[in-house]
């Protein structure tokens, strides 16, 4: 995991716009009529309806999708009591997670009040605004009383995630670990090291699932909590043991079946793990340093089943697996509470998910052939897209069956489909691409190594574990620029292609290229001269296996790069062209656009190749291709010019690929409006389908369209260009590409190299 510096963190949070969240209108506001509907006088009508029936607030406002993340800053992460305002970045971050994982809107509320009674009154006063309340970073024991009172006195879901999030995920892990080792939950002995909010909640949930309370031993900073201890809180009394023969962790853990650590790092020794029962379960959840490291636990004995809070080891216990989806299910049923039935439903849904076949996208992110249920995998991965549908639906169903729901769901398949549609960016594509690249980083050559943006991207890619960068350029210039930018080039290879020390490599590359192209008018001397050019040299590094991928474009015209790529790398078998694609991640969904850079005025055969390459690319990104070939006419209404070429291309594709979901030619608005298309052109192969791929009739149309959207809709994430059709991973960037753009293309190049390696 890349080290995060103070400067990185502050720069990220400040940025061009401080903070991590914003409020975005969801209704039109462009005309005076729009504004009259949004505010006075039109706004009076929903106000009056809500006055008559308060439940209509869920119908006419965002209440049903709005959660308050509320804190008083008394127990912020590992920072302690830093105050309400100081904790605001954490609350904004929690809001970000709610949004990206479950599409839930969040207002972070920082209440500068440590008195529980006054805090409760403040929260109650603002509660009508929200559909749910997530309590965050409130110290124990006050957090227990605050949550209890708010749950009793409010009619919306309230959950203190610090307590219940860890409990729910670890409980799911416990059930599955017990299935792996074959032990009976009613007989296991549990040691809980820590007695804070999360520890108490975990113990309570374990008991609800079948652990006997008398089989639990809990420890705090003073040792074993037993009935002889004085001045215990009510929560500690609840789990005080009657045993007086044990006082320390070392004594308590002998013969234990499960260790749950919610305390501090490096407190559990190898010897203690060896003293546990057979096939012990160890949940070492202290952060950032667990009670025992994964390596030490595995060295202590081979039969241990271990989970930590860290993402770089198997079976991570991460609250993000739970809270977004628990609130999603609660909000979608307008539940009055998050009760025990809903929490238990979440536990079982999460546990069950780990036993199901894993989506290929998850395997790719973690670079395994096939994750299967067992010792190395008994808790679902946070990137699993099924969490949204399965956990949310389980919680919603439990809300309905337990009687706390005010809205019913009749069609559960449609509900799950709605969740995917509602999220828009259902695949969290960018995150998954970067995670996949990190799982198996490759050697990537950056052509313009002395360009500030490319150097920054290369350094960031190395720090994030995306690739092993190789910078092409003059050593001295690169070193000087790195110093000016205060960047460390440690671990980054610099290749000065024009230096004498590279003479033998230039000659070797020239001979290989000459042998490949000598029947096309090449001479060795010409080939050798070309090796002084960064694109020829860099692509030959990939061609010969000295590198795995190549990125270029900041200084070079595409026409030249295209020519070099065809000469050095060549096209994939079965294709006469190559092309590029951009990915558009919008609130409406993820769209793929081609060809955005390569083919200026494609004829019919070229359009067919672009469609074939696009279909292949969609499968590469784990999307079902639903492709529209667009033009200025609809289904033959005008067969002149480029529309005629598109029309002919569709005829060929329909004939050669009768099962593909592709049609055209059609206008862009028809392609993107399913209802309009279905009503006007019910004969289309795309009937009832939402298009996710647009293939344009010419380069100017595709390029202008995505760049216009980039300028007019900054909240749309644009990813690319992505090369399709070359034999090896050669990828291009725009001359105005940002560091993030280059980083994204780098991740794509790495995945391309991983795929190329498997061929």
Whereabouts are the PLM-identified features?
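NAD(P)-binding Rossmann-fold cofactor-contacting core
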Residues: 193, 209-236
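Anion-binding alpha/beta catalytic cores of soluble intermediary-metabolism enzymes, centered on
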Residues: 85, 137-184, 406-409, 415-759
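Glycine-rich adenosine-cofactor-binding loop
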Residues: 66-78, 83, 167-171, 181-207
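N-terminal ligand-binding/catalytic initiation module
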Residues: 1-158, 353, 392, 397-398, ...
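A short, aliphatic-rich alpha-helical micro-motif
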Residues: 127, 185, 252-253, 273-276, ...
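Rossmann-like adenosine-cofactor binding region
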Residues: 237-305, 310-312
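Adenosine-phosphate binding glycine-rich loop
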Residues: 2-3, 161-162, 181-183, 284-392, ...
């Amino acid at each position: 995991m890349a080290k995060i510096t103070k400067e990185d963190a502050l720069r990220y949070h400040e940025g061009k716009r401080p903070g991590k969240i914003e409020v975005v209108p969801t209704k039109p506001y462009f005309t005076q009529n729009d504004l009259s509907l949004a505010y006075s006088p039109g706004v009076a009508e929903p106000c009056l309806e809500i006055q008559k029936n308060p439940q209509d607030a869920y119908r006419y406002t965002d209440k049903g999708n709005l959660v308050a993340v509320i804190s008083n800053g008394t127990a912020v992460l590992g920072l302690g009591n830093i105050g309400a305002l100081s904790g605001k970045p954490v609350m904004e971050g929690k809001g970000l997670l709610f949004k990206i994982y479950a599409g839930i809107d969040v207002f972070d509320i920082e209440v500068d009040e440590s008195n529980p009674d006054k805090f409760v009154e403040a929260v109650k006063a603002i509660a009508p605004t929200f559909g749910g309340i997530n309590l965050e970073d409130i110290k124990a024991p006050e957090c227990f009383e605050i949550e209890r009172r708010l749950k009793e006195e409010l009619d919306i879901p309230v959950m203190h995630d610090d307590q219940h999030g860890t409990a729910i995920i670890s409980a799911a892990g416990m059930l599955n670990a017990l299935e792996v080792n074959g032990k009976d939950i009613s007989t296991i002995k549990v040691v809980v090291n820590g007695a804070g909010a999360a520890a108490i909640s975990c113990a309570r949930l374990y008991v609800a699932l079948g652990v006997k309370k008398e089989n639990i031993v809990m420890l705090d900073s003073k040792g074993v909590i037993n009935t002889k201890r004085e001045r215990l809180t009510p929560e500690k009394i609840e789990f005080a043991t009657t045993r007086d023969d044990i006082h320390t962790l070392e004594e308590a853990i002998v013969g234990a079946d499960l260790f749950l650590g919610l305390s501090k790092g490096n407190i559990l020794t190898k010897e203690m793990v060896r003293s546990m029962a057979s096939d012990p379960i160890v949940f070492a959840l202290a952060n950032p340093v667990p009670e025992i490291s994964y390596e030490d636990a595995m060295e202590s004995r081979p039969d241990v089943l271990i989970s930590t809070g860290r993402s770089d080891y198997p079976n991570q216990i991460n609250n993000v697996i739970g809270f977004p989806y628990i609130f999603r299910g609660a909000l979608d049923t307008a539940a009055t509470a998050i009760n025990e039935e809903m929490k238990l439903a979440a536990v079982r849904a999460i546990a069950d998910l780990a036993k199901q076949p894993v989506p290929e996208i998850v395997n790719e992110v973690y670079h395994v052939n096939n994750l299967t249920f067992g010792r190395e995998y008994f808790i679902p991965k946070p990137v699993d897209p099924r969490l949204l549908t399965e956990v949310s639906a389980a919680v919603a169903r439990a809300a309905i069956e337990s009687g706390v729901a005010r809205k019913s769901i009749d069609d559960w398949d449609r509900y799950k489909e709605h969740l995917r549609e509602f999220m828009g960016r259902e695949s969290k594509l960018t995150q998954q691409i970067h995670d996949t690249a990190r799982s198996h980083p490759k050697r990537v050559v950056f052509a313009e190594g002395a360009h500030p943006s490319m150097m920054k991207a290369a350094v960031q890619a190395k720090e994030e574990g995306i690739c092993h960068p190789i910078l092409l350029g003059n050593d001295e210039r690169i070193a000087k620029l790195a110093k000016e930018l205060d960047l460390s080039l440690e671990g980054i290879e610099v290749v000065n292609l024009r230096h004498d020390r590279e003479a033998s490599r230039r000659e070797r590359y020239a001979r290989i290229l000459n042998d490949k192209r000598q029947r096309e008018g090449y001479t060795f001397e010409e080939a050798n001269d070309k090796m002084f050019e960064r694109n020829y040299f860099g692509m030959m590094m990939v061609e010969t296996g000295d590198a795995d991928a190549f990125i270029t474009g900041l200084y070079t015209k595409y026409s030249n790069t295209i020519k070099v790529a065809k000469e050095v790398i060549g096209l994939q078998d079965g294709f006469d062209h190559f092309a590029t694609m951009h990915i558009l991640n919008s609130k409406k969904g993820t769209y793929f656009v081609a060809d955005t850079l390569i083919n200026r005025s494609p004829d019919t055969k070229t359009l067919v190749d672009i469609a074939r390459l696009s279909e292949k690319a969609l499968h590469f990104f784990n999307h079902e291709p639903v492709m529209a070939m667009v033009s200025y006419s609809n289904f033959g209404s005008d067969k002149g010019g480029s529309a005629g070429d598109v029309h002919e291309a569709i005829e060929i594709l329909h004939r050669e690929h009768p099962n593909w979901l592709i049609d055209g030619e059609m206008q862009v608005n028809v392609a993107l409006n399913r209802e309009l298309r279905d009503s006007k052109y019910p004969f289309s192969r795309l009937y009832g389908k939402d298009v996710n791929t647009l293939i344009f009739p010419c380069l100017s149309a595709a390029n202008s369209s995505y760049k216009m959207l980039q300028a007019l809709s900054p909240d749309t994430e644009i990813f690319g260009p992505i090369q399709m059709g070359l034999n090896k991973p050669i990828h291009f960037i725009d001359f105005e590409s940002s560091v993030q753009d280059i980083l994204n293309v780098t991740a794509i190049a790495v995945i391309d190299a991983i795929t190329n390696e498997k061929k």
